[in-house]
Amino acid sequence: RQQLAELPPTEREQVLLALVRESATTVLGHAPSTQIDSDQPFKELGFDSLTGIELRNLLQAKTGASLPASVVFDYPDPETLANGLGAILFPPTEPSNRSAGLISTSHHDLFGELYLRAMENGQLAHAQELMLSGAQLRAKFHDPAELDAAPSVVRIGSAQQGPHMICVCPTVMTTGPQVYTRFAEQFTDGWTVSALVPPGFDGGEALPATREALVRSLADSVEDYVGDSELSLVGHSSGGVVAYELAKELQGRGLDPTAVVLIDSYSFDGDGGRPEEMFRNALNARMIEYLRWASGDKLSERITAQVWSLELLRGWRPEGLSAPTLYVRPIQPLVEEEKPEWRGDVISMMTSVADVPGDHFTILEGEHVGSTARVVDHWLRNLR
């Protein structure tokens, strides 16, 4: 970093760009002589959520900058990433709008670390209380017009035409477009697949004060993104709950979604047959594992946003939507103590139900994501 500081700004930009291109080549396993164009999208180069984090970790190790796990989505090509890297390493002397997705290199997140430590020690209730108290102190918005920036919609699929499939990211601390990258990769044609990221999870973003504020902010972004084009909504876990409520809001605006797909979504009121604390511990264990690997990602902001958002979704029931709905149910329980009927109150309100191999997480990962995507694709095509 000191060596970079001694360079003139123009030369520094070139060095950072070369560093990004070289690091991308290394992560992809290409020969050192391989040339990557500065404006070539990372998606076209073959980056996914895992290789994106590898690139992020490599750049952090080389520069000391703290970058988000979703870096290849926030900064879609080497030149854009190099510019963002320069902005955080050498910020302007005058105050300016923060660089989206980047945080201070000197910040130590004690609050977030306390939460992770409590979760690792099995102190779920204490961890939740701690972060809910923090969430209550964060800035809130009641009207989407109060936001500095609208929730982002990020193209994650390779197809450039076809009806829109908007995947609503879950309201959890690991949220981001990377949740759906493997799912989106399965749709090589026929659908324009994008991810919609909820507000409040990035540094400095306000939290929605109410469920209505959350849904309206997302609806504004979707309306701007798709116009009057055909669209379907997909959501995994809490993302499915938000997708359902978002569809109702769009329906009220005269922008009727073709369909809504809920991938193992559920209400948050301790449904009968689900061992609530064990289930939540299993969910959090997986997310903590990810955050430990992708450390430095604004833990306090992300965790308080998760706790607050899930509070907003309490009491949810799938009612008031005219669009057809599909519930995708994993056949493998997340914890052995689950009873198969605990999803009943949600499933009973769905148009269709499809069982797929895997558990709550693996239905969107590895060998099982293909089965999930095929079920969704087949069901949506039959509606057309």
Residues of each region from the PLM?
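Short acidic (Asp/Glu) and glycine-rich catalytic loops that position anionic groups and cofactors
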Residues: 1, 60-65, 352-353
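A short alpha-helix capping/helix-coil boundary motif
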Residues: 1, 33-36, 224-226
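Glycine-rich phosphate/pyrophosphate-binding loop
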Residues: 1-12
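Generic, ordered loop/turn and secondary-structure boundary motif
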Residues: 5, 37, 43, 51, ...
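Short, contiguous strand/loop micro-motifs
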Residues: 7-8, 42-43, 234, 303
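Phosphopantetheine-dependent thiolation modules in NRPS/PKS and related acyl-activating systems
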Residues: 10, 14-141, 265-270, 370-373
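A hydrolase-biased, glycine/serine/histidine/acidic-enriched motif that marks catalytic-domain neighborhoods
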Residues: 18, 99-384
